[in-house]
């Protein structure tokens, strides 16, 4: 081998290392999800599943309502965290991904148009864009889902209005469930394609492989605070129900 044509790469400049974040030690993986986002994810998932399963039972109606309000509160946290949190979780970052998905669809359309420019389509980007769109759509549908549920519970508009709100609430609930299914299917498909468990980082926060951490700080304290706020709200509702 000619060693002159394959020089050993030197260390990255200091400013590049700071921009990319600290490099994960071998065997630990890269930090890609911080503790608050993981806590939000699982509280949101459990609250949504619990609310959906208790939707058709009059006996568990209060549980359904309380868990629905919990989902709405978690959405509020996600919006705030999307404004002041780490860059990967910013709403602007999500917006750019959705815009990228639209641009990608335009590329696909141009590639399938006879006599067009026939651009090269990056098919590997499809799951990434679909994942981003499904997550944004899921978060967006929570607001009308909560509002229609609130209107149903408080019987806005009398009997006629209650039926309308109930139908809309059921529609948005099924839409949200469908988006959850799309999210899980994309996650499973990407995990199979890349031969990596892409769901594991939402538990451990780390993704297998070497490279810089995407998140500089884990912020365990904020995750604990979020959990305590949710538990305090559930406890408060429980005390009121017993009175």
Question: What is each of the regions a protein language model found here?
Answer:
Residues 1-243:
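Membrane-embedded alpha-helical bundles that constitute the cytochrome b-like, heme-associated redox core
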